[in-house]
Design a protein with these regions (language model features):
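Structural marker of alpha-solenoid helical repeat scaffolds
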Residues: 14, 47-51
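Canonical tetratricopeptide repeat
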Residues: 24, 58-62
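Register position in tetratricopeptide repeats
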Residues: 31, 48, 62-69
Length: 73
């Protein structure tokens, strides 16, 4: 998983507004249980997308699903 974070962070270093990298990085954070970092990526997408974009919508849904599963335990 470390390589995933390394590569997505490098993609964002090269292009800080790359919506796909923010979405996938947020989803990767969810896979390791770091909801706060996933929400940071969602906030970044909120600033980048002038109108709701699919990357924002998809990450928001993934976070909601993650939180619903966590609260159901």
């Amino acid at each position: 998983m470390d390589l995933v974070f390394l590569h997505y962070n490098e993609a964002l270093r090269l292009d800080p507004k790359h919506r796909g990298a923010h979405e996938y990085l947020g989803e990767a954070y969810l896979q390791v249980g770091n909801v706060a970092k996933a929400k940071d990526e969602l906030a970044a997408l909120d600033k980048i997308c002038f109108f709701p974009c699919s990357e924002y919508t998809d990450l928001k849904a993934a976070i909601s699903q993650y939180e619903a599963r966590a609260s159901a335990k």
